[in-house]
UniProtKB/Swiss-Prot annotation:
Pfam families tied to this protein: XRCC4
Taxonomic source organism: Arabidopsis thaliana (Mouse-ear cress)
Top-level division of the source organism's lineage: Eukaryota
Protein name, UniProt field: DNA repair protein XRCC4
Subunit structure: Interacts with LIG4 and specifically binds its tandem BRCT domains. Interacts with POLL.
Length: 264
């Protein structure tokens, strides 16, 4: 199935605008059980739709008017917009759970039908398609639409492939840049850590030198203090000895003086 919004493309099916109405086109290769595939092209308006059908040799058309669509929608208790949306869903995309049929009707007409479920009930919609007055024109129109759509799809694939390649190239560039930044970050952290260790070790060495210097000064001060104490003790001992000797001499003199007095 190929679905195309004609507003965004320049197909042979020109978009028509009536009171800001946007026309959409769809084309479905419809597989029908027990029959050859058919192509169903739909043109969807806000309140009506047109269908062209071809099996390759013959073609049929169904031009559903606003009145007919409104009547069908009323029969199913649906708003027109909801009815058209559901019809486009089933004729724009083959639904796997739906049973499609394209059976004979009177006067060479065909009856296009499809089934769907609503609230557990299986329902069927039918639309009568009349023989086209110009089967060749209808068939060629559908083929042109398919070719135009395939060209647009091919261009989209090419553009998306280019965009993907560009995105992949950008992603690879970003990845390489990210890896480079990661390496630079690791290198910076390693250099910073090495510098930090160098500064830390230098400070530790300086602190050790200061401690050693303080220890040396303290040892010298302690030695000097010890020397002074020993000198003081030595001086004190000499004084005490002098005093003792003087005291002994005085005592001895007194003793001798006493003896002289006694003799007198």
């Amino acid at each position: 199935m190929i679905g195309v919004d004609s507003k965004s493309s320049s197909t042979t099916f020109i978009e028509t605008m009536v009171e800001s109405e946007k026309t959409k086109h769809t084309c479905l290769r419809l597989e029908i059980s027990g029959a050859d595939p058919i192509f169903v092209k739909g043109t969807w308006h806000n309140s009506r739709f047109d269908i062209s059908v071809t099996d390759g040799s013959s073609s049929w058309i169904c031009n559903a008017t606003e009145e007919e669509v409104a009547e069908r929608a009323a029969q199913w208790d649906q708003p027109v917009s909801e009815y058209l949306k559901l019809a486009e869903q089933y004729l724009g995309f083959q639904q796997p759970n739906s049973v499609y049929s394209f059976s004979d009707a009177l006067e060479g007409s065909k009856r296009l039908s499809w089934t769907f479920e609503k609230e557990g009930t299986k329902l069927e919609w039918r639309w009568k398609c009349k023989p086209s007055d110009d089967s060749k024109k209808i068939t060629v129109g559908i083929l042109d639409f398919l070719m135009e759509a395939n060209i647009r799809l091919s261009e989209e694939v090419v553009n998306k492939t280019r965009s993907f390649e560009k995105m992949r190239s950008e992603a690879e560039r970003c990845l390489a840049q990210g890896e480079k930044l990661c390496d630079e970050k690791t290198e910076f952290e390693s250099a910073t850590y090495a510098k930090f260790l160098s500064v830390l070790n230098a400070k530790k060495a300086k602190l050790r030198a200061l401690r050693d210097k303080e220890d040396s000064v303290r040892v010298v001060e302690e030695e000097e203090s010890t020397d002074k104490a020993e000198s003081f003790e030595s001086g004190r001992s000499d004084d005490e000895k002098s005093e003792e000797e003087a005291s002994k001499k005085a005592t001895s003199s007194k003793a001798r003086g006493g003896k002289r007095a006694a003799r007198s």
